[in-house]
Amino acid sequence: MQNYWSNNLGSSRRWLMFALGTTLSWGVWGALIEIPEKLGFPATLGYSVWALTMIPCAILALRSDNWRLALHREAWVFGSLIGFLGAGGQLILFEALRSGPAFIVFPIVSLYPAITIILSLWLLKEQASTRNWIGICLALPAIALLSYVAPNDTLISGYTWLFLAMGVFLMWGLQAYFMKLASDRMPSESMFFYMTLTGVLLIPIAVTMTDFSQPINWSFTGPY
């Protein structure tokens, strides 16, 4: 199967530039994501807007690859699986936060890279040096500590939220692993297209999860 990534990617360290770019982009996204909800626009509807904004990005991605969409079975299976794991995990996270404490939910979910690391070392036979292992062992607890939210007086009942949080932890870890696995089987542009498609398909579920009995900011300041 043709490898769509450049053979010189690892040697030139371009992957590090992309990883840092992703970290920066997701960091900005994480800093801004709570603003619409604080302005009265529910997170579930925020998901719907987010999924729709992926459409022009998917179009630009396909255009950059001369409109070549991978249609073989591995492409749409991996692409759809990655999309459902990511977007579905986000919807489950909303439900976990409704009944569970954020100061426990977020540290659990934030450790999902552990799943990706274990699967990559075990199934993909990737090698990690002693220095890599030191970095991993320092990074994982750091992620959990940075994700910690101070407890409040919210009454906690039952453990459904805990199973939901563990589900998100597992889904996002698997998503990152399958993204790595799929990168050798399909172009990243096609992968993003299928991720967009599955994200949009989950919009009706996000809408049904919305509590419309509460006041919603439908003005431009809400979804914007």
Regions found by a protein language model. Give the residues of each.
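Hydrophobic/small/kink-forming positions within alpha-helical transmembrane segments
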Residues: T23, G27, A31, I59, ...
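Specific alpha-helical transmembrane segments that line the substrate/conduction pathway
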Residues: S48-L52, L97-L124
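Loop-to-transmembrane-helix transition segments
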Residues: R14-T22, W67-I92, T160-V168, Q214-Y224
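Juxtamembrane helix-loop boundary signature in multi-pass membrane transporters
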Residues: M1-G21, A114-L170
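Structural motif at transmembrane-helix junctions in multi-pass transporters
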Residues: K38-L45, L91-I108, D184-S190
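C-terminal ends of transmembrane helices
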Residues: Y4-N7, A58-A70, A114-T130, L174-R185
